[in-house]
């Protein structure tokens, strides 16, 4: 086939695929345009997950009638001059958003600047542009997108359900609302108001987005180094979520999901929170524009810093100083476990039920409630060593997290108590579910949990199936759900934290996944809630009970997330490590 130039329509549709890969991307681009136009109030309406209709209205400067045809041309912008590319101060600068949206759907732009007698409208349908026409309208701009991706039907095959796409749109608006707290924001999804925020300061906006109960627990941070300043709010190590979607980072007013910043936050919390948990964070970074390259990602979500090490160090130091305050010391572990390169042990063989009294107690009593008995502080006699115990007898507990045992052949065994108990809890919950339904424990005082509208929709949409897992949830007015019962095995769990984690799990799983598979992920999340935590001191009887139960549990060599629960060190391994082996 000979080389030929592509026609403009095909070029626009290819470019649209890079810029507008889903409805949330269109919402983000349109709201950024409104902010760049100096809007003090922005309204967003979503219908059908953003595939049916997106509307963004603002009271900004507006577009003159004569410039409307230019506004929907590719690489036409009022935000950039030739010499300003290295000092970008606006959210948008490429001139790609409107033409990309117009190439993918049906785009209508209605705008009126101050001083213009009436508004003007231009329509783009699948790349075809209609004539500008005068219409009535207030000062500002209204952009409507309908039937998104009708011109590129292949793109629709890769979209998730309308509810999930609406949730992603809402997340995008929330991130932008945090980036610009001085601007009022409203969001309506399928006719229902999701939120309506007046202009606020940062603290008020954080409380509106995260909920006042969580916002009151957040720690304020501030750090300045030369020309770089970091300010914001983070959660103590005792307040975490099941997903990282509650982390919002803003650089020079631009909401980003930059890997360097996210990694710095993760490193700051690394030895303070369990694996699989994520802190809450709302952070604003101010840095000279010439020290930042924002033109490195199609969605402008990632950045390139001139001094990445300095930025990383600033964030890690600021977060760790805040976490070291007296309010958070109780949640921080006193000793950290050094990293090793030991491989996980080979899969554990299945053994007959052990006859120890501790094992019977664990299997018959503790697995029923999935709660280890309180640790005793009185001196105890070590259990008698038995050569037929694959995991041996416990010798000690290391860092209040790992059980050290010795098997009959002299092998040292290390067991992660949380990961191991999590697997046992998960197996117990699965057995109850497969036998019909997981028993529910009604709460004496039902718990009211405030949540975003899209999380409420996810929970209520799966409410009937969640009831089969023992979690009974119902609507409770606007912006909240009522938790009436939790799985009996999780009777002591925090119902509000459980509901939030289940909502996060449903959101993170993606709605392309079958509900049954999602519920599997929910069940694993539930198991994590009731498992004995790292940092909990165990008595020898408790340690032995856990080891004996592991020996009779399938898949006990890994936790539900695939991490190892057991590591083994033979005498030969130790001799090689100490240089004794020939």
From Swiss-Prot:
Belongs to the DNA mismatch repair MutL/HexB family. The keyword DNA damage applies. PROSITE patterns: DNA_MISMATCH_REPAIR_1. SMART domains: DNA_mis_repair, MutL_C. Keywords: DNA damage, DNA repair. It comes from the Bacteria. One of its GO terms (molecular function) is ATP hydrolysis activity. One of its GO terms (cellular component) is mismatch repair complex. NCBIfam families: mutl. One of its GO terms (biological process) is mismatch repair. HAMAP family: DNA_mis_repair (MF_00149). This is DNA mismatch repair protein MutL. InterPro entries: DNA_mismatch_repair_CS, DNA_mismatch_repair_MutL, DNA_mismatch_S5_2-like, HATPase_C_sf, MutL/Mlh/PMS, MutL/Mlh/Pms-like, MutL_C, MutL_C_dimsub. It holds the Pfam family HATPase_c_3. It comes from Acidiphilium cryptum (strain JF-5). This protein is involved in the repair of mismatches in DNA. It is required for dam-dependent methyl-directed DNA mismatch repair. May act as a 'molecular matchmaker', a protein that promotes the formation of a stable complex between two or more DNA-binding proteins in an ATP-dependent manner without itself being part of a final effector complex.
